[in-house]
């Protein structure tokens, strides 16, 4: 089977849904729960879930420091929802001891659109995604409050950035894995290929 080997952090979240979208986008998805598995991938997806819980699990599974090192070394990573939070340099509304991987020069606000009952769907024009607007599912979603000069905003809801890219890092505040549309995953897989990481 050809295509880059893309890991999915399999501690919490929509692992199967991401795997399905990655397969459709031409990648070979694999579950990542340990550092030895992380070392074998060309790129990584950080799925949604509860960001503080995922952060604690990263410590339990001894993945936090290997992930930070991999991101610093240029591993392409795509974070959706909680994954966006984990890739941020700082979080508004988070716990002061919340572990972050970092890498994206952004400050995000947790639950920016409200609680679970305030979850919603929208159609977004996403830079780099051809075709009709992307159907985006927002579930207790963050948004980007501040972004550094190196961060490219790819999509917004009202004025709030909800999709950003910085070098090999991509993040969405929404869950593209839930809609059956693999175009955002394809954007990431293509970036892995173009980075030279894809085997």
Curated annotation (Swiss-Prot):
One GO BP: glutamine catabolic process
InterPro entries: Class_I_gatase-like (IPR029062), PdxT/SNO (IPR002161), PdxT/SNO_CS (IPR021196)
GO cellular component, as recorded: cytosol; glutaminase complex
This enzyme's EC code(s): 4.3.3.6, 3.5.1.2
Organism: Frankia casuarinae (strain DSM 45818 / CECT 9043 / HFP020203 / CcI3)
Protein name: Pyridoxal 5'-phosphate synthase subunit PdxT
Catalytic activity entry: aldehydo-D-ribose 5-phosphate + D-glyceraldehyde 3-phosphate + L-glutamine = pyridoxal 5'-phosphate + L-glutamate + phosphate + 3 H2O + H(+); L-glutamine + H2O = L-glutamate + NH4(+)
Active site: 81 (nucleophile), 175 (charge relay system), 177 (charge relay system)
């Amino acid at each position: 089977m050809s295509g880059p080997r893309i890991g999915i952090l399999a501690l919490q979240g929509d692992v199967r849904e991401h795997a399905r979208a990655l397969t459709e986008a031409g990648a070979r998805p694999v579950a990542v729960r340990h550092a030895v598995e992380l070392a074998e991938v060309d790129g990584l997806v950080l799925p949604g879930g509860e960001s503080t819980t995922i952060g604690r699990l990263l410590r339990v599974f001894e993945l936090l420091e290997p992930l930070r090192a991999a991101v610093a070394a240029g591993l392409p990573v795509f974070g959706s929802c909680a994954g966006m939070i984990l890739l941020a340099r700082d979080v508004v509304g988070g716990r002061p001891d919340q572990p972050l991987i970092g890498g994206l020069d952004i400050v995000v606000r947790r639950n920016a659109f409200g609680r679970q009952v305030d979850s919603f769907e929208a159609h977004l024009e996403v830079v780099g995604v051809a075709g009709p607007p992307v159907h985006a599912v927002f579930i207790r979603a963050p948004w980007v409050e501040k972004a550094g000069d190196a961060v490219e905003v790819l999509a917004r809801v009202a004025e709030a950035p909800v999709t950003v890219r910085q070098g090999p890092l991509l993040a969405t505040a929404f869950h593209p894995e839930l809609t059956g549309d693999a175009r955002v995953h394809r954007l990431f897989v293509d970036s892995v290929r173009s980075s030279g990481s894809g085997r």
